[in-house]
Amino acid sequence: MKKISTTLLLLIIAVLCHAQMAEPVKFTAQLKTNGTADAEIVFTGKIDDGWHVYSTQLGQSGPIEASLTATTTDGIQLVGKLTPRGKEINKYDNMFGMTVRYFEHTATFVQKVRFTKEQYHLECALEYGACSDQTCMPPAEVTLSRKGKAPAFIAAKGNEATKADEATKADEA
């Protein structure tokens, strides 16, 4: 009976400890289109107080920097590099022995893309590192997977239909 009680107590403690492990950074990902061939992949993170998310292109000896990996880009091409947006903090970090750039409270990373075919399929992931003054999370990632008809091609077909309607009306007049 004592072994069962001890095992049960250890199990309860493990569950409670796991429940207390908060996720200090929560990212959302979206593909923002504007009806043209150009669009943006936007990753927006909410960062808990006391934590920060590192920016892009920090160098090899630094912390885990934000980076984008695109595994599927059928009908869509990346344009340029992943770009940080928002209030970036530049600060010397004793742990890394270098000046690092990071975000507190919110972080936004944007990758420009261009649709190249009528149908597209995109799968990508943002990898990032986050730390507090006491600890760092292991590298984390947020994924985005989208497929469908490119907005620019939908708009172009709509314009062709409008022009055909106008030509028909002109012929009838």
Residue ranges and their predicted role:
Residues 1-2, 21:
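N-terminal hydrophobic targeting signals that begin at the initiator methionine
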Residues 2-10:
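Sec-dependent signal peptide recognition
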Residues 10-18:
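Hydrophobic h-region of N-terminal signal peptides that target proteins for export
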Residues 18-173:
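Extracellular/lumen-exposed scaffold segments
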